[in-house]
Structure formats: structure tokens, C-alpha cells
A protein has these predicted regions:
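Gly/serine-rich nucleotide phosphate-binding loop at the start of the catalytic core
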Residues: 1-74
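Short, conserved catalytic/metal-binding motifs centered on acidic residues
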Residues: 43, 85-99, 131, 179-187, ...
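Electropositive, glycine- and tryptophan-enriched low-complexity nucleic-acid-binding patches
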Residues: 54-58, 113-177, 276-307
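Active-site-proximal, Lys/Arg-enriched surface segment
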Residues: 59-139
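Short amphipathic alpha-helical "interface-anchor" segments enriched in bulky aromatics
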Residues: 95, 309-340
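An internal, acidic/charged active-site-proximal segment
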Residues: 149-281, 371-381
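Basic, amphipathic alpha-helical segments enriched in Lys/Arg and hydrophobic/aromatic residues
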Residues: 337-393
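Long, low-complexity C-terminal extensions of enzymes
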Residues: 369, 376-444
Length: 444
């Protein structure tokens, strides 16, 4: 990574902006460097935001961002390996809670995270889906490749497939071999069926009670009735249905604890029989058996190449970097702090946060870092340390944004004008569409 790549990235994202492009770019630089900001208007205190605090809100209200072009810039400037190598993609969603925003449109009930044990709660808000480039080693940070809000009329799996189709096509064109890593709710038949059209391998975590089926047996001569559509049952939590695995690997993890990996091939889900997958069981003898550190984990592998059993366990843990990225975006880059009134403004703010996140990752090799007295010096800087050192680099780079042009004072509202109260919008509850069985009627 060099200064030219960072300059190319900055000019590339500036070219993706339409209206209010200068204010949007100033917002990215302010977000990347103003470590003292704890609220959205405080970003205007940054010397790299050359406008007043009201321009922050006006940029998100009037701004335009070309999402397709922004995705291309992200892929073009991402720290990708050489052609022919594997590249790991993480797909996941994160929630922006808006419980009191009655005037905000298209809010859905989303589950709340980090609750006490056995506690379940839902809160109105918006769901945003991310596709990120996962680092090959822990602690290096993720690189955002695409963001999209999940509307009330769509499912997160459908949005994720649409994102992955666009991102994977760009990566394959560069000669790379993507591997998609996802959590349990993506290991469903609709997602796997749609993903069969994507030129990528897939490693998804599976719930322990998930049921698969083996291929249907060959029809015997003279057999009566319809042929079986599914073979024997395979339930992850029932060892009696497993049988002998097709492949077994045994080794140790980074801490020296014993790890066993078993693989059963040629399985499928009942509602997606044409999608053949391999079911993988990982037994980590060094785990404590808790929900956060399970002893036994289940995964699904889909791809043209056989599952690399020796790499499955470390590869599956790469997705945790995406959760750390969400935490950084919310706690440091103020992603969930602004109380924006429309979904469109929230989508623009999400794209601005993604630009700032990626800019910090690209700038990390160019900076020595800014350490606090109690911080231990590390070989790899955290993105927070990079953010504190960014002002020096931004002064060296300059900005493609034009300086502000004061327009004087606005005339204000006309005398006697009274704005109407904003419309209230209900919270939308997503439910599964199941046909109710009709009641049988008897004729007299």
C-alpha cells in the first residue's frame, strides 16, 4: 500500500458523489480524523470540515451517492491478494435501533443483541447488510465492499445474494477465487439456491438441529408407486443418523488443543434438492462448551472444489472480524449516533461511514500511529490509533473538494407560514406467509 493508492481511493469516492459532493467529502475527512467528536454535529469542529454544522445534515439530505460506482471503487482499491488466490468475503447484517422515531418510514421489528441470558426483545429500527473483505489474520480489520439497507418488503438473504452477485463478479474479473463466510441464518435453502448461480465457494455455520438428506436411492425394476425424492435423513444433533464420515482430519489449533474435523458429502436440503452440499462437524477439545465457545460446531460447504478440512476451523473464525468492524463503526465512527429522519439519509450516512472506515484501513501502512501512555505498542495499529494520526496525513494529501461558497442569509419562512406536523408511520412486523388450511364445509 502506498500514497498513490490512497489518493486514487479518495478521488474515486469523490467522483461517486453528485449533489453536495464537497460537503460529503468533507464529512468523510472529518469522520476519519476528529477523534474528540462524540455527536454528529461535533464533526463540524474538525479543521477538515470547512463548512458550518448545518451542512452536515444538508449533505445527507440533498447529497447523491452512486452506489454501483462506489462498489467498483471499493473493489478496485481494496487490499486484495494476487490473481488466482482465495479471497474471503463476510456477509452479515447489523441493526440501527430507532424505537422513538415515529415519523421515520419503513421501520421493522428487529431483535436486540447483547441481552442477558434467556432474554429476548425486539425493537423498531432499520437493518443494514454488509459485504466485507475479511482479513487473513485476526486483528487486521475488515474492508467494506458493499452496503445495502434491508427494506420491509425484502429478506436479508435476498439482499445479501444481490450484493454478493455484484461483488463476486468484480472479484472474479480480477482473477480471484472468493469464499463466502456467513452465520447460521444464511444456511437456508433459499439462500443456497440463489447462491448456486454465484461463482464462489461458500462456508456457512449451521444450527445444530438442522436436517439434511442423502441422495435418493435408485429406483428398482418393478417398483410400484412414486420414486423417493430424498434419501436417508441426516440430523446434526442425532448421531444415529450420521453414519461414517466421508473424510476425517485431526490436528491442533493455535493454542495446541486437539481439533477434529469430519465431513459428510453429497447432502441436500429438502426444499433445495438440486443444491449439493457437504456438512462439516468441528470438535474443539479445548473449548469450554459455552454458547460463545462451543465444543461442537456445524458448517455447510458448497463449491466446486472439495472442502479443505485442515483450513475449515481457522477459516470459519475469520467472520468474527466483521463483528469487530461493526463495533468500531458504532462506537468510534458514530454510525448509530445521528437520529436521521428518513431511510435514504441513513443509507447515505452508512456509505459515508464505510468510506471513512476504508480510508483508515488504507492509511494504516502509511502512519506510525498515535499511542496513548497506557497503550502497548503493537506491530499492527488499530484503526482507532490510525484515526488519531490521520490529521497529519490529510494535510499532506490535500482534498479534491472545493472550498465553500457562502450564499448569504436565506430569506427564511414566509410570514404566517405554519408547517404541518410530520406524518406518523407504523412499525412493520415481518411475518412468514403461511397459507391457512380452509375449513371443510358439509353440504346440507
Amino acid at each position: 500500500m502506498n500514497l498513490n493508492t490512497l489518493n486514487e481511493f479518495r478521488h474515486g469516492i469523490y467522483g461517486c458523489f453528485g449533489n453536495a459532493k464537497d460537503a460529503l467529502f468533507n464529512t468523510i475527512d472529518a469522520l476519519s480524523s476528529e477523534a474528540a467528536a462524540r455527536s454528529f454535529p461535533e464533526l463540524s469542529f474538525s479543521p477538515f470540515f470547512e463548512r458550518t454544522w448545518a451542512s452536515l445534515y444538508e449533505a445527507l439530505e440533498d447529497g447523491q451517492i452512486d452506489a454501483q460506482r462506489l462498489r467498483q471503487v471499493f473493489v478496485q482499491c481494496a487490499p486484495l491478494p494476487a490473481a488466482g488466490q482465495y479471497v474471503f468475503l463476510g456477509v452479515d447484517t447489523s441493526n440501527l435501533y430507532r424505537p422513538e422515531a415515529e415519523t421515520a418510514q419503513d421501520r421493522t421489528l428487529v431483535p436486540m443483541a447483547n441481552l442477558p441470558k434467556d432474554a429476548h426483545a425486539a425493537c423498531p429500527g432499520w437493518v443494514v447488510s454488509h459485504v466485507v473483505l475479511l482479513p487473513s489474520q485476526a486483528g487486521q480489520g475488515t474492508f467494506v465492499l458493499d452496503t445495502a439497507r434491508v427494506t420491509s418488503t425484502e429478506l436479508a438473504t435476498v439482499v445479501a445474494v444481490r450484493q454478493l452477485q455484484a461483488v463476486v463478479a468484480l472479484l472474479v474479473a480480477r482473477g480471484l477465487r472468493p469464499i463466502i463466510i456467513g452465520d447460521r441464518w444464511y444456511a437456508c435453502a433459499p439462500f443456497l439456491a440463489r447462491l448456486s448461480e454465484v461463482s464462489a465457494h461458500c462456508l456457512l455455520r449451521v444450527k445444530s438441529h438442522r436436517v439434511f438428506y442423502r441422495p435418493a436411492p435408485v429406483r428398482r425394476p418393478g417398483q410400484l408407486g412414486a420414486s423417493r425424492k430424498d434419501g436417508d435423513r441426516f440430523q446434526c444433533s442425532d448421531e444415529r443418523t450420521h453414519g461414517e464420515p466421508d473424510e476425517v482430519w485431526e490436528g491442533s489449533d493455535a493454542k495446541g488443543a486437539r481439533v477434529q474435523v469430519r465431513c459428510w458429502k453429497h447432502l441436500h436440503l429438502r426444499t433445495a434438492r438440486w443444491v449439493e452440499v457437504s456438512v462439516i462437524q468441528i470438535i474443539r477439545h479445548g473449548a469450554n462448551g459455552s454458547a460463545r465457545d462451543p465444543r461442537v460446531s456445524w458448517f455447510v460447504w458448497k463449491g466446486d472444489d472439495p472442502a479443505p478440512l485442515a483450513e475449515i476451523s481457522p477459516t470459519s473464525r475469520l467472520r468474527y472480524s466483521q463483528e469487530h468492524g461493526y463495533r468500531f463503526d458504532k462506537q468510534v465512527l458514530l454510525w448509530d449516533v445521528p437520529r436521521l429522519s428518513t431511510p435514504a439519509r441513513t443509507e447515505r450516512w452508512t456509505q459515508v461511514v464505510a468510506c471513512a472506515h476504508n480510508q483508515l484501513l488504507l492509511a494504516r501502512p502509511l502512519l506510525d500511529g498515535s499511542y496513548r501512555p497506557w497503550e502497548t505498542r503493537r506491530s499492527i495499529l488499530t484503526l482507532g490509533q490510525v484515526r488519531r494520526a490521520m490529521p497529519t496525513l490529510l494535510r499532506q494529501l490535500g482534498t479534491p473538494a472545493r472550498p465553500p461558497q457562502p450564499r448569504g442569509k436565506a430569506p427564511g419562512r414566509a410570514k404566517g407560514f405554519h408547517p404541518k406536523p410530520r406524518a406518523r408511520h407504523p412499525v412493520i412486523r415481518k411475518t412468514s406467509k403461511k397459507q391457512k388450511k380452509g375449513k371443510k364445509t358439509t353440504s346440507a
